[in-house]
Amino acid sequence: MAIQSDSLSSLPDSPRIVAPQPVSPNEESIERALRPKALEEYVGQQRAREQLEIFIAAARKRGEALDHVLLFGPPGLGKTTLAHIIAHEMGVQLRQTSGPVLERPGDLAALLTNLERNDVLFIDEIHRLSPVVEEILYPALEDFQIDILIGEGPAARSVKLDLQPFTLVGATTRAGMLTNPLRDRFGIVSRLEFYNTDELARIVTRSASLLNADITADGAHEVARRSRGTPRIANRLLRRVRDYAQVKSHGVIDQDAAGRALAMLDVDPQGLDVMDRKLLEAIVHKFDGGPVGVDSLAAAIGEERDTIEDVIEPYLIQHGYLQRTPRGRTATLTTWRHLGLTPPAAASGGTGELFSK
């Protein structure tokens, strides 16, 4: 059973269908319904899954709390799901919150003092904990104790409270922003990687079954290959493709129906959407492939600088469509090919690694 305190995510102002973050509160509730409950149901992340199977089995045999767990990686890959699975496999409750919600030491103390033996406390966006709250967390993680201040002024005194043994599961998309003292207190650290197409197809097939949607193997594969390696995106695209199939394809999601539905949604075979293509086309057509500064690029496409840096660019850089250089953003040969264009002779002939395969 999970006990959740406050909303765990700040929703984007302009949701994209290929956004890796949740785009609505309703989507979060659907995710909970589709979430696997046990490690044997969890698809992908083989290394992390195998490690957790061993560590959980050992902790249960000893009757101890699992060591503290840090999960990091891009959004939408299953960090929250793994936290729930850990609690389920340990047979304990999960209490769920997020770094920005814990504004004062008392907020964290209230959670910690209400934990039962071996419970799991899940803190999403743990890199956003305030320093004063983080200080309270250190003795709780090491010694299962916290110090609280009673009274005010000269009469104030510190009281040490014992806590039940518990497991902290921290999740972050920015492991580099964690302080060293906090990072060092996690005994189990797992990085979640993007999923391959076969793994996503298995997830899509499972989700379709739970949604009572009729899907073929090639239909699941078509949804999977456009999902940018991210289960959250795969499940979102599946729901939209299901709607299309019910109206246009007699309810059956095959490769043709999935392809037509995703084309209607402007998600191309590589998973790029309108915003991705708008940025790449601006670099190629307006700036001759770059380099171009991010402020000039923002003005050219009518988007905020932060939107480009935080929302659009990461996927394009990770998958080789775009490079950041000291002089600005530059389109790679992959971009020119994707847009069906021939790169300038100077670009294709003398740019070294930018245009090498």
From Swiss-Prot:
GO terms for cellular component: cytoplasm; Holliday junction resolvase complex. Residues 269-357 are annotated as: Head domain (RuvB-H). DNA binds at residues 305, 324, 329. The keyword Hydrolase applies. Residues 1-15 have a biased composition (Low complexity). Keywords: ATP-binding, Cytoplasm, DNA damage, DNA recombination, DNA repair, DNA-binding, Hydrolase, Nucleotide-binding. Residues 13-195 are annotated as: Large ATPase domain (RuvB-L). It catalyses: ATP + H2O = ADP + phosphate + H(+). GO terms for biological process: DNA recombination; DNA repair. It is found in: Cytoplasm. ATP binds at residues 34-35, 76, 79-81, 142-144, 185, 195, 232. It comes from the Bacteria. Residues 1-30 are annotated as: Disordered. Coiled coil: none annotated. The keyword Hydrolase applies. Residues 196-266 are annotated as: Small ATPAse domain (RuvB-S). Its EC number is 3.6.4.-. Has 3 domains, the large (RuvB-L) and small ATPase (RuvB-S) domains and the C-terminal head (RuvB-H) domain. The head domain binds DNA, while the ATPase domains jointly bind ATP, ADP or are empty depending on the state of the subunit in the translocation cycle. During a single DNA translocation step the structure of each domain remains the same, but their relative positions change. Belongs to the RuvB family. NCBIfam families: PRK00080.1, ruvB. Homohexamer. Forms an RuvA(8)-RuvB(12)-Holliday junction (HJ) complex. HJ DNA is sandwiched between 2 RuvA tetramers; dsDNA enters through RuvA and exits via RuvB. An RuvB hexamer assembles on each DNA strand where it exits the tetramer. Each RuvB hexamer is contacted by two RuvA subunits (via domain III) on 2 adjacent RuvB subunits; this complex drives branch migration. In the full resolvosome a probable DNA-RuvA(4)-RuvB(12)-RuvC(2) complex forms which resolves the HJ. The RuvA-RuvB-RuvC complex processes Holliday junction (HJ) DNA during genetic recombination and DNA repair, while the RuvA-RuvB complex plays an important role in the rescue of blocked DNA replication forks via replication fork reversal (RFR). RuvA specifically binds to HJ cruciform DNA, conferring on it an open structure. The RuvB hexamer acts as an ATP-dependent pump, pulling dsDNA into and through the RuvAB complex. RuvB forms 2 homohexamers on either side of HJ DNA bound by 1 or 2 RuvA tetramers; 4 subunits per hexamer contact DNA at a time. This is Holliday junction branch migration complex subunit RuvB. The lineage of its organism: Bacteria, Pseudomonadati, Pseudomonadota, Betaproteobacteria, Burkholderiales.
